[in-house]
Amino acid sequence: MSEKQKTVWSLLGAGLSAATVASKLGSTRQFVNQTKLAAEAKLSASLLDAAQANHLQTRMLDPKKGILLGYHPGVKCKAVVTYSTKFGIKVWYWYDNPEAVTDKEFLGQTRRYLLEMAKERRIKVIGMKSIHPGKLAQLVFSELVPGLKE
């Protein structure tokens, strides 16, 4: 995505109206809406490309939220492909026991990413900053993907 597309997608995702985004950027609502559509098309293609590269079967795609739910038949688990304007595209595999991961550097990076994504998506994480990042991932992704826990 271009920088303008990232900006428009991010501002609209933060809950601002097209008119407010247009005013903030010094442009028109028509420009904002066209840019949003172009951004969502590029984001859809990028999420699908990431899913294909990771051998995932796509179950759900929501470019407005920057998320794709997939399934990896080889390892028999769900996977979530996410997009963040700050961190780009990431692939997350859905494990039943995320607390088993103990690598401190990886867990720190994961926590930063998840907290940033929760902030971008307006997901409340009050009191969640001290829980294991694997559990935090389950909570954040469950907010973004209906029915993920099943």
Residues covered by each model-derived region:
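Short helix-coil-helix linker/hinge
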Residues: 1-6
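Short helix-to-turn junction characteristic of helix-turn-helix DNA-binding domains
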Residues: 9-16
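Short alpha-helical "recognition helix" segments of helix-turn-helix
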Residues: 17-28
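Short Lys/Arg-enriched helix C-cap and helix-to-coil transition segments
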Residues: 43-59
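Helix-turn-helix/homeodomain-like alpha-helical modules used for DNA recognition
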Residues: 56-130
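Non-catalytic terminal/accessory regions
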Residues: 122-150
